[in-house]
């Protein structure tokens, strides 16, 4: 892997991690079209660190408040809306953890293909369009109960299927439940913190036990590039989502999905 490849892959990861357009659909393109080799475990860990830093720093006030409220609820019986939201994020994280442990090998062997990614990119894009068109858009993230949190968590678990998009699935589920677009995005981004942490930790443990060589320059390129691109992406997505809706992302997903199919059929 060259520094140029490291920069492009980290840029793709940072820009697509928090948009409802599927990072896996984009990360398959360089290898499918340009023949780039797999970037390796160390680089995967690096871009996870970069995107995690971006969302934690962007939502730093909310993260601190939610952590304080969570511990206050455990040790002091705090029942504030912040404590409730913190617990809803915990509940929403559980399905992905269970699904990941049970289905990880099946997904890796049978579902990580370009045809699956193209199909899910299209199907979940159409689902996002339908939900956004018919949603009530009235609730905020603090109105989340355990049933809603579990429903969104199941959507996050299904997003482990390549091409689905974690943010796309969770935002779609939240919109279906009546969240405003901005609230759906905020809840999705806050939900990403524990799941990216767990995924990065798992990859980190695999890296340690694999003995794979680590190139510090590539790692720093991955961390810095994914951090900057993800931070900018979060900022502008939240600023623009209420007025532009999900249609631009739906159109983009359809173009990407059908374009990937066309490439595969011609290859």
Swiss-Prot record:
EC annotation from Swiss-Prot or TrEMBL: 3.6.1.27
Catalytic activity from the UniProt record: di-trans,octa-cis-undecaprenyl diphosphate + H2O = di-trans,octa-cis-undecaprenyl phosphate + phosphate + H(+)
GO function terms (MF aspect): undecaprenyl-diphosphatase activity
GO cellular component terms listed in the entry, alphabetical order: plasma membrane
A family per Pfam: BacA
Compartment annotation: Cell inner membrane
Predominant cellular place of this UniProt entry's protein: membrane
Regions that span the bilayer: 1-21, 39-59, 83-103, 111-131, 144-164, 189-209, 218-238, 246-266
Signal peptide per UniProt: none
GO biological process: cell wall organization; peptidoglycan biosynthetic process; regulation of cell shape; response to antibiotic
InterPro entries assigned to the protein according to its UniProt record, in alphabetical order: UppP
Topology within the bilayer: Multi-pass membrane protein
Alphabetized UniProt keyword annotations: Antibiotic resistance, Cell inner membrane, Cell membrane, Cell shape, Cell wall biogenesis/degradation, Hydrolase, Membrane, Peptidoglycan synthesis, Transmembrane, Transmembrane helix
Annotated family: Belongs to the UppP family.
Biological role stated in the UniProt entry: Catalyzes the dephosphorylation of undecaprenyl diphosphate (UPP). Confers resistance to bacitracin.
Note: Bacitracin is thought to be involved in the inhibition of peptidoglycan synthesis by sequestering undecaprenyl diphosphate, thereby reducing the pool of lipid carrier available.
Name of the protein in its database record: Undecaprenyl-diphosphatase
Species of provenance: Vibrio campbellii (strain ATCC BAA-1116)
């Amino acid at each position: 892997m060259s520094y140029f490849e490291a920069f492009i892959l980290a840029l793709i990861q940072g820009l697509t991690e928090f948009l409802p357009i599927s990072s896996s659909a984009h990360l398959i393109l360089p290898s499918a079209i340009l023949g780039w080799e797999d970037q390796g475990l160390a680089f995967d860990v690096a871009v996870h660190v970069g995107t995690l830093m971006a969302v934690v720093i962007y939502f730093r006030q909310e993260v601190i408040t939610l952590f304080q409220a969570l511990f206050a609820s455990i040790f002091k019986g705090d029942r504030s809306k912040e404590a409730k939201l913190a617990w809803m994020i915990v509940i929403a994280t559980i399905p992905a953890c269970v699904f990941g442990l049970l289905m990880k090998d099946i997904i890796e062997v049978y579902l990580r293909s370009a045809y699956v990614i193209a199909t899910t990119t299209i199907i979940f894009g159409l689902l996002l369009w339908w939900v956004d068109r018919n949603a009530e858009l009235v609730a905020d993230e603090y109105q989340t109960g355990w049933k809603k949190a579990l429903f969104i968590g199941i959507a996050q678990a299904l997003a482990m299927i390549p091409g689905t998009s974690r943010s796309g699935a969770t935002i779609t589920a939240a919109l279906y439940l009546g969240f405003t677009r901005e609230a759906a995005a905020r809840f999705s981004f806050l939900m990403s913190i524990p799941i990216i942490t767990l995924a990065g930790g798992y990859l980190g443990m695999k890296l340690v036990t694999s003995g794979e060589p680590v190139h510090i320059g590539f790692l720093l390129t991955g961390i810095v590039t994914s951090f900057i691109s993800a931070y900018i992406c979060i900022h502008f997505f939240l600023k623009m989502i209420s007025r532009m809706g999900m249609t631009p992302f739906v159109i983009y997903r359809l173009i990407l999905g059908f374009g990937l199919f066309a490439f595969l059929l011609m290859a």
